[in-house]
Amino acid sequence: MFFHIVLERNMQLHPRYFGRNLRDNLVSKLMKDVEGTCSGRHGFVVAVTGIENIGKGLIRDGTGFVTFPVKYQCVVFRPFKGEILEAVVTMVNKMGFFAEAGPVQIFVSNHLIPDDMEFQSGDMPNYTTSDGSVKIQKDSEVRLKIIGTRVDATEIFCIGTIKDDFLGVINDPATV
């Protein structure tokens, strides 16, 4: 889920940022460039927590830009198979539903929803139990288990299930 790791990045800085605030400018550019991004290997970078080392700059020929090797600590979010997450439902259709847990989108197929829940179409599509006591619709909060992940270069997709003990709707916006 969340990990605190050390990463490295080569930062290019324009000559106008040189001077007394060089380090501050480098750190703010690093935060702007990496926070909120996703690398397939490490996951989503949530926050930069510290700078371990800023190496000596190397002037690039012809441009005046300087490349600094920066070693920094950060918190990353990476979901794994078998992990239990709480997510918010964003879309419901007859094939299943999509939910989001932070930056990760999770699809739960109708085959991975308990058998006693049926799809109800209409202006607010949902999955409802036969007695109507539990309803999964847009903005419902669900607890689910990740059963598969696919990692791209810039995004992570997950497949989840609520067909297990203690999984399912946590908070239904219709009852609030």
UniProtKB/Swiss-Prot annotation:
Chief localization: nucleus
GO cellular component annotations of the record: P-body; RNA polymerase II, core complex
Cited Pfam families: S1, SHS2_Rpb7-N
Keywords assigned by UniProt, alphabetized: DNA-directed RNA polymerase, Nucleus, Transcription
GO biological process, one term: transcription initiation at RNA polymerase II promoter
Localization in the cell: Nucleus
Taxonomy, superkingdom: Eukaryota
MF annotations from Gene Ontology: single-stranded DNA binding; single-stranded RNA binding; translation initiation factor binding
Its biological purpose: DNA-dependent RNA polymerase catalyzes the transcription of DNA into RNA using the four ribonucleoside triphosphates as substrates. Component of RNA polymerase II which synthesizes mRNA precursors and many functional non-coding RNAs. Pol II is the central component of the basal RNA polymerase II transcription machinery. It is composed of mobile elements that move relative to each other. RPB7 is part of a subcomplex with RPB4 that binds to a pocket formed by RPB1, RPB2 and RPB6 at the base of the clamp element.
Subunit structure: Component of the RNA polymerase II (Pol II) complex consisting of 12 subunits. RPB4 and RPB7 form a subcomplex that protrudes from the 10-subunit Pol II core complex.
Family: Belongs to the eukaryotic RPB7/RPC8 RNA polymerase subunit family.
Protein name, as recorded: DNA-directed RNA polymerase II subunit RPB7
Native organism: Glycine max (Soybean)
Taxonomic placement: Eukaryota, Viridiplantae, Streptophyta, Embryophyta, Tracheophyta
